[in-house]
From Swiss-Prot:
A zinc finger (TRAF-type) spans 151-203, 204-260. Belongs to the TNF receptor-associated factor family. A subfamily. GO terms for biological process: antigen processing and presentation of exogenous peptide antigen via MHC class II; antiviral innate immune response; autophagosome assembly; bone resorption; canonical NF-kappaB signal transduction; CD40 signaling pathway; cytoplasmic pattern recognition receptor signaling pathway; DNA damage response. It is found in: Cytoplasm; Cytoplasm, Cell cortex; Nucleus; Lipid droplet. Keywords: Coiled coil, Cytoplasm, DNA damage, Immunity, Isopeptide bond, Lipid droplet, Metal-binding, Nucleus, Osteopetrosis, Repeat, Transferase, Ubl conjugation, Ubl conjugation pathway, Zinc, Zinc-finger. This is TNF receptor-associated factor 6. Pfam families: TRAF-mep_MATH, TRAF6_Z2, zf-C3HC4_2, zf-TRAF. The keyword Flavoprotein does not apply. It catalyses: S-ubiquitinyl-[E2 ubiquitin-conjugating enzyme]-L-cysteine + [acceptor protein]-L-lysine = [E2 ubiquitin-conjugating enzyme]-L-cysteine + N(6)-ubiquitinyl-[acceptor protein]-L-lysine. There is a cross-link at residues 125, 143, 473 (Glycyl lysine isopeptide (Lys-Gly) (interchain with G-Cter in SUMO)). Residues 310-368 form a coiled coil. There is a cross-link at residues 125, 339 (Glycyl lysine isopeptide (Lys-Gly) (interchain with G-Cter in ubiquitin)). The coiled coil domain mediates homo- and hetero-oligomerization.
Amino acid sequence: MSLLHCENSCGSSQSESDCCAAMAASSCGTAAKDDSVSGTASTVTLSSSFMEEIQGYDVEFDPPLESKYECPICLMALREAVQTPCGHRFCKACIIKSIRDAGHKCPVDNEILLENQLFPDNFAKREILSLMVKCPNEGCLHKMELRHLEEHQAHCEFALMSCPQCQRPFQKCHLNIHILKECPRRQVPCENCAVSMAFEDKEIHEQNCPLANVICEYCNTMLIREQMPNHYDLDCPTAPVPCTFSAFGCHEKMQRNHLARHLQENTQSHMRMMAQAVQTLSLAVAPVPQCTMPLYDSVPPTRPSSGRHSEVHNFQETIQQLEGRLVRQDHQIRELTAKMETQSMYVNELKRTIRTLEDKVAEIEAQQCNGIYIWKIGNFGMHLKSQEEEKPVVIHSPGFYTGKPGYKLCMRLHLQLPSAQRCANYISLFVHTMQGEYDSHLPWPFQGTIRLTILDQSEAAVRQNHEEIMDAKPELLAFQRPTIPRNPKGFGYVTFMHLEALRQRTFIKDDTLLVRCEVSTRFDMGSLRREGFQPRSTDSGI
């Protein structure tokens, strides 16, 4: 049986009481409803407080827990104790899970047991909550009644908390000291340049900081690091330098403060090296042959410099032509840029107009539905693959109207992940109210009946659609007049249909799933009832 439910479509956690209420309603075979928040989360996930209640209280009691308060299933202290007609006590979540997984029988004596036969054992609950327990946090010696344990843990100085910088767990009483003095990711300033960095990066930074003090390896002078290259090249008196005449063949190297003495002592040898280099250069230059003909016989009749002047003149003309062409191209580029900007404005305006027209067409189409809308979800195989890969799958339908005038609604479909508690591998289906054209003329909150159907697309004469019907509950926020384009609160079924059931018939055809929504407001609810399909009541199973 599907669980009728209003859930938070943003994936936010429900409170402990909401989760328990939903489970209780499910165990009685009824549809539990609550508000839902629309968003992009992948599935409806159980809150952390509910997950803690899957089994009994796993705490150390002082004195030790009596066996009569132990759950026979989880062997822990009874949480939300319930009693069976055969007199056995169980955790509420444990026995419900046992009935659903192992069948309708008592795990102790195998007596027939239905969920609606369970009743709360408030006496045992009070007794257990009054028992003394030890704080589970290491180092804490506090004892308190079980009912106060959660409040104590929220303030216990020995509770573990993650460091916001390095993410390692520490007890709350030691966390501040760790953050300020011990955390390797704590921010510290460089003593030289005042740049802030993580403590674990400080050593590497100090090895490269441009303002850090360093000592010259030759003269032991202390300078900042960015001055050291110039010091080596120009100032250091003991840095090794080559002889000034190294280009002429002197390969001696000495300290800079010894260079002057070296030049003075080796003046003659340096002069010989220079003379030899000049002589070698002179021999490398070939002699100019003498002319044997008169000069006027070897020179053309034109002036010697006329050819050069002509070339220069041609170059000047070419440069002027290129400059003129460059100016014209610059003007053309500016004109084209201006035209492009104007056309871009026109294109953007056309896009806005097209979007407006598309919205109007969609609005007109939505108004023609008259309360019956068939949602075609294409590429459904891709959505199923994403669900198997634990990727979020949340899809919203276009808006549609219940009539003209009428309320504007939309549907939201979740594919619950395989890891989801209690609703793994289910299709969740919800309805949201939307801001519509006629909202100011309609009575609020919305009242009526909604039938949700996944259509069988087989060619059989009798098609077996999967459908559920629900009555609106005006007191819920899901049916109030929306104040934003889509009401964040939704109403529907967390476990509308199992994916395994989806594959057993031709619900998916041509990679398309068809979801039908039929809405009857309070003015035309008789149509559904004439068909003999009565909505489920939250009290029908009690």
